[in-house]
Amino acid sequence: MIDKVKSPLLTEKSIRLLQKNQYTFQVNSDVNKTEFKKWIEIFFKVKVMSINSCRPPRKKKRIGLISGYTVRYKKIIVTLKSGDSIPLFSI
């Protein structure tokens, strides 16, 4: 499962969500909510309250005469029980 998690997302919005005890990850498109919830609870030993996921739209990119699209990915936002935290995101 660890190979399906690409990276933690640290954007302006995700940093604001850290104050609400919500953590954002970029994962492969084939990951579903239930297996990701089990993985987070086992790996980080925290209690997950809810999980939201979305697949942002592709953006059109152009380099010279060649045009294409960015790679699709899935973003998962994990809400933890108050008092729990993931040390990976400690700023």
Swiss-Prot record:
Keywords: Chloroplast, Plastid, Ribonucleoprotein, Ribosomal protein, RNA-binding, rRNA-binding. One of its GO terms (cellular component) is ribosome. One of its GO terms (molecular function) is rRNA binding. Coiled coil: none annotated. Its main location: plastid. It is found in: Plastid, Chloroplast. GO terms for biological process: translation. The keyword Chloroplast applies. Binds to 23S rRNA. Part of the 50S ribosomal subunit. Belongs to the universal ribosomal protein uL23 family. This is Large ribosomal subunit protein uL23c. It comes from Chaetosphaeridium globosum. The gene is rpl23.
